[in-house]
Amino acid sequence: MSVFTKGIYDRLYNDPILRSKINTYNSEPAIFTVEPVPGNARLPYVVVSGPISDVPFDTKTSLGREQTVDIRCYTENHGSKQEVEEIAERVRELFHRQSITITGYKNIITSCTGPVFIPEDEALGMVVTVRFINEKEGI
């Protein structure tokens, strides 16, 4: 797992409110950083994508990266969107305008768009898109 993915995972993993809203997998919170999600994983769970964009954010005196990551939230479709909305809103609260720890980098900006619904056949899904600007330390 990259230092960027680890920073995101750690923020999600260490939040007791989020943990209370999602299932477990192998005795750990059901937060996945690989796809596809294991077939025996039970909803609700959260999936952290790899970067959907990753571009330089360099200056004359610094090296940086601007990355965009999707964090998808899934629940069973019981006819109500409340559960998936609560999980997705919590994910947004954990990242929007919050600084996260990334080994070797200083997190300059974190902002979110969404959550928005994503079409799924068997489950309800919402995605929070998170934009990070990180500056490499020690340059």
Please place each PLM-identified region on the residue numbering.
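Residue-level signal for secondary-structure boundary sites
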Residues: P56, G79, K136-G138
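Small/polar-rich, solvent-exposed N-terminal microdomains that initiate assembly or binding
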Residues: M1-T59, Q98
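Oligomerization/assembly interface segments of phage tail-like spikes and tubes
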Residues: S62-H78, L124-E135
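Short histidine-centered beta-strand/loop micro-motifs
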Residues: F57-S62, E83-E85
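Acidic-leaning, charged glycine-interspersed low-complexity segments
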Residues: S20-K21, Y25, R92-I139
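Mid-chain, well-packed structural core segment of small domains
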Residues: C73-E93
